């Protein structure tokens, strides 16, 4: 049974590492959080607290 040369293991590790980094970065940048609706923003601005000292 033939054995793999060390350079082949290094190349395999580099390929899997690049694939893992690309997969993680694509998942990170493809996430789009839900932005608050304009109605909610208006309610937040209207209900602001006025401090009376």
Curated annotation (Swiss-Prot):
It is found in: Mitochondrion membrane. GO terms for biological process: proton motive force-driven ATP synthesis. Pfam families: ATP-synt_8. It comes from the Eukaryota. GO terms for cellular component: mitochondrial membrane; proton-transporting ATP synthase complex. The keyword Transmembrane applies. Keywords: ATP synthesis, CF(0), Hydrogen ion transport, Ion transport, Membrane, Mitochondrion, Transmembrane, Transmembrane helix, Transport. Belongs to the ATPase protein 8 family. Mitochondrial membrane ATP synthase (F(1)F(0) ATP synthase or Complex V) produces ATP from ADP in the presence of a proton gradient across the membrane which is generated by electron transport complexes of the respiratory chain. F-type ATPases consist of two structural domains, F(1) - containing the extramembraneous catalytic core and F(0) - containing the membrane proton channel, linked together by a central stalk and a peripheral stalk. During catalysis, ATP synthesis in the catalytic domain of F(1) is coupled via a rotary mechanism of the central stalk subunits to proton translocation. This is ATP synthase protein 8. It comes from Drosophila sechellia (Fruit fly).
